[in-house]
Regions:
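Catalytic His-Asp segment of secreted/periplasmic serine-dependent ester chemistry enzymes
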Residues: 146-220
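Structural recognition of the beta-strand scaffold that forms the well-ordered cores
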Residues: 4-8, 13, 49-53, 98-103, ...
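N-terminal secretory targeting modules
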Residues: 1-8, 12-33, 210-220
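Surface-exposed acidic, glycine-flexible loop patches that form ligand/cofactor-binding
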Residues: 85-96, 131-135, 209-215
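Sec-exported extracytoplasmic/periplasmic mature domains
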Residues: 13, 46, 50, 105, ...
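Generic structural signal for well-ordered alpha-helices
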Residues: 124-129, 157
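Conserved SGNH/GDSL esterase-like catalytic core that processes O-acyl groups on lipids
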Residues: 18, 23-115, 147-153, 189
Length: 220
């Protein structure tokens, strides 16, 4: 396809529990990336997607503090998910996305804890610079602040305010973006209905930033 969206995320972007109800625990067979906000938004814009996502990953703190010293800014540089020493050369790849959407931070603020602001901001800027190094100074990035902690928006905004980079944007998903009953799947993750609501919230931002016009397409 002519349009491509790159997504960088965690279990939400992986589709963790999208085929579950909120009364079920997670099972691998209920993970379906095709039912995420990312795929719904790509379908809306008739775009392909590049997905760099791994459950439990954060910017400066992984879920419950697991795997210290190795975060999504490290994993983003890899060609393979579990192979650290083979780096991805984006400049040699013939296709370039039109925008990168970062949807990270939930795990940083997981289990009732908050990451150190200075390290979070530092690592977030590192990720932004990695993306710019891949695609160019003027390349657009949309940073999405998840809904689980309002402080996260301030952390991400501070990273954007101090990074010195152009064409980097921010939006926030608040707790009202979806409900905690019929929109929820396994283990506190949204199901397909919840993901569609997230996609509806993000689509106007992507349209404005990229210049891709809103269409009459159904978000599905």
């Amino acid at each position: 396809k002519e349009r491509i969206i790159e997504y960088i995320g965690d279990s939400y972007t992986c589709g963790y529990g999208t085929e579950s109800s909120n009364k079920e625990r997670f099972k691998p067979e209920t993970e379906n990336q095709n039912l995420t906000y990312a795929c719904a938004m790509a379908r809306y814009f008739d775009a392909d997607q590049i997905v760099v996502a791994h459950s439990g990953m954060g910017i400066s703190r992984n879920y419950n503090g697991n795997v210290k010293g190795y975060f999504m800014p490290d994993r983003y540089l890899q060609t393979y998910d579990l192979v650290k020493d083979v780096k991805w050369d984006a400049k040699s790849f013939p296709l370039k996305p039109g925008i990168t959407v970062i949807y990270l931070g939930t795990n940083d603020f997981s289990t009732g804890m908050q990451p150190a602001e200075r390290l979070f901001v530092k690592n977030y800027i590192t990720l932004l610079k990695e993306i710019k190094d891949n695609y160019g100074e003027d390349y657009p990035i949309l940073c999405v602040a998840p809904k689980n902690d309002l402080l996260m928006f301030d952390y991400i905004r501070k990273a954007l305010d101090s990074c010195g980079l152009k064409n980097v944007h921010i939006m926030a998903l608040t707790k009202s973006v979806h409900n905690n009953d019929s929109d929820m799947g396994a283990d506190g993750h949204p199901n397909y209905a919840g993901h569609l609501k997230k996609a509806h919230a993000m689509i106007p931002y992507v349209s404005t930033i990229t210049g891709w016009e809103l269409t009459g397409n159904e978000v599905k």
